Each structure stands twice: as structure tokens, then as C-alpha cells.
A protein has these predicted regions:
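Short amphipathic beta-strand/extended segments with alternating polar/hydrophobic composition
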Residues: 6, 18-28, 104-111, 221-231, ...
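Short beta-strand and beta-hairpin "edge-sheet" elements
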Residues: 96-146
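Intrinsically disordered, low-complexity segments enriched in serine, threonine, and glycine
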Residues: 150-300
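Polar/acidic, low-complexity leader/linker segments enriched in S/T/G and N/D
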Residues: 1-45
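A short, compositionally biased
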Residues: 4-9, 87-92, 206-207
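Oligomerization/assembly interface segments of phage tail-like spikes and tubes
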Residues: 49-75, 125-141, 279
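Short, acidic/charged, Gly/Pro-enriched secondary-structure junctions
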Residues: 71-115, 280
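Charged, amphipathic alpha-helical segments and their flanking helix caps
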Residues: 84-91, 147-156
Length: 300
């Protein structure tokens, strides 16, 4: 016997299409629910030459799948066609569950299956039945929709706000101070990359050496750093950004990234990430003043 989920577990959205507007509802078959706590992993191993067993070199997360059981009671022909259009797309879309509306997965819909009976009602064809929607997240983690609780207007906020790890409001976080320091906080489950943006002089005046560090407030020890030689702009660049996901220093202008790279100006140090769920971290910059820092919270 299928049981419709109650309360905040009843809905989800895909590609900004709400489940209730599509005429469907999530259901249970009456047994316990299954959920993967973490994405699928793939071990990196090499067989021991001439011996037993394998050498283990760690694991990589690969992908994550979601299967959603649904039911529909009075689905019209128009809604049936809309289901085909929404879940038949080959493009990636945002999947958001109502019980955790602070994060989204980028997923692809695949093999939606429906079982139904069809009958007439008031001169219109009506569908009643059940089905399964399957989604694959090739990037296996979720990202934050917003970063601070006051940006959410969900009625069930009290149920998930603590689990989200988010701060009530932005306050002084992510703002460049006069001395070049930026207070950062990562509410996610995993360390997160960031993009740090700088402007370049309009003329060809070179900028001086730049040092970027990660440390905790009121603690002198640097946990990570990246040092750059002074350099001048290239071509039509109006700025550059340090991207710790791609490990690139990229030029940009008003039209976007220009394809110019400045990695040859790295003297020493490494690209680094922001640790999760730890208070007091700040990114300090000397030699230049950033104009913006951009990062997401990454969740399982």
C-alpha cells in the first residue's frame, strides 16, 4: 500500500517546477525509506605485484542517484504532457527537497516510469497511478541556495536551520575590510573552494607582490598561503581572479573570462580551501585589495 508523505516531506522541485503544480506527490510503499548518506565511491587500487592483495591509494566520489516514488490521482492530459516535457529533458536541473530547502543538487532525469489507469471525467481524460522518477547527480554533492538564514522565507525553517549550519545573517562575513582581511565561514560538510577577485589598473602600471593567507582571527599562525610576484595586466583584462577549484589565476573583463592566465607569477605556496564548520577563519591579503570573494557551501 502506497502512503503519501505528510508535512514537509510531501514536495520537491526540479528545474523550478514544483511537484504539486505538476499534479504529483511523493509516496512511500509503507516500508522504511532508503537514503544514501554519502555518494558512491570508487577505490583507487593497484594489485600487489607477485603477491596477494592490493595497494590502496584512496577513494574518489563518483556520482549520486535519487529515486523518488510518486503518485497522481487526477492527472489531466495537459499535466501528463507536462510531465513528459519536464522529466524528459536531457539538460541538468536543480533538484530541491522540501525538507532540506537550503541545498540543491544538479541532476539529470533518466527513465521516468509510470503505471496508471485512464478514465474519463467531465469529458476529459484523467490518469491515476504511481511511478518512479530517477535522477543522477554527476557532481555528487549539493550546494547552498543562499548562505545566510535571513535569506530564506521557508515556513519550515525552524526544522532545518540548525542542521544547515548557517549563520543567521551576513554581518561582517565575506566583506573586504580596510586592512585586506575577509572573515569567512563555511557552513557546509566539506571544505570549499573560493574565487577571490581583484581589479587591475586601467593603465599598465604594475601591481606589487601579493600575499594571500588563511589563518584564524587573533592567531598568528598561517594555515595556508599563496605568494605572487608583481605583474602587469595582459591584453584587455580589467581584473584577475584566483580560482582555487581550477587552481588558475584568470584574467577577466566586463564580458567575462578572457582566457588569459597569470599562474607564472606564483612564487610559492599553494591554492587552498576554506575548512568546514569552524569559526574564526579569515583570508588576509597584502599587496592588493580584493573586490569580492565568492564561494558556496558544499553538503553531502
Amino acid at each position: 500500500m502506497a502512503i503519501a508523505l505528510k508535512g514537509d516531506f510531501i514536495g520537491f522541485s526540479f528545474n523550478e517546477h514544483r511537484s504539486e503544480s505538476l499534479g504529483i506527490v511523493r509516496i512511500s510503499d509503507g516500508s522504511r525509506y532508503n537514503e544514501d548518506l554519502v555518494p558512491t565511491t570508487q577505490d583507487k587500487t593497484v594489485q600487489v605485484p607477485g603477491g596477494d592483495g592490493f595497494y590502496y591509494f584512496g577513494s574518489d566520489y563518483t556520482q549520486r542517484q535519487f529515486s523518488i516514488n510518486i503518485a497522481f490521482d487526477e492527472l489531466t492530459e495537459k499535466q501528463f504532457r507536462e510531465l513528459q516535457q519536464v522529466f524528459g529533458t536531457k539538460e541538468l536541473g536543480k533538484l530541491i527537497f522540501d525538507e532540506r530547502p537550503y541545498k540543491y543538487y544538479m541532476v539529470k532525469s533518466s527513465k521516468p516510469q509510470l503505471k496508471y489507469i485512464c478514465f474519463g471525467k467531465d469529458g476529459e481524460r484523467i490518469y491515476k497511478g504511481e511511478g518512479t522518477l530517477t535522477f543522477t547527480a554527476y557532481y555528487p554533492f549539493a550546494k547552498s541556495i543562499f548562505k545566510f538564514l535571513n535569506e530564506y522565507g521557508n515556513k519550515n525553517k525552524d526544522e532545518w536551520k540548525e542542521a544547515s549550519g548557517m549563520k543567521p545573517e551576513k554581518g561582517t562575513y565575506d566583506i573586504v575590510s580596510n586592512n585586506g582581511s575577509i572573515s569567512v565561514y563555511n557552513a557546509g560538510d566539506l571544505e570549499t573552494d573560493f574565487i577571490l577577485k581583484f581589479s587591475l589598473p586601467i593603465d599598465n602600471t604594475p601591481i606589487g607582490d601579493i600575499k594571500i593567507t588563511l589563518s584564524k582571527e587573533n592567531v598568528g599562525k598561517e594555515e595556508a598561503f599563496l605568494d605572487l610576484n608583481g605583474f602587469s595586466k595582459k591584453g584587455a583584462d580589467t581584473g584577475f581572479q584566483i580560482n582555487t577549484k581550477t587552481n588558475l589565476i584568470e584574467g577577466f573583463n566586463a564580458e567575462g573570462l578572457t582566457g588569459t592566465l597569470y599562474n607564472e607569477n606564483i612564487i610559492q605556496g599553494d591554492f587552498f580551501k576554506i575548512p568546514p564548520r569552524e569559526e574564526g577563519y579569515q583570508i588576509n591579503v597584502t599587496g592588493a585589495t580584493p573586490i569580492e570573494i565568492v564561494y558556496d557551501y558544499i553538503y553531502y
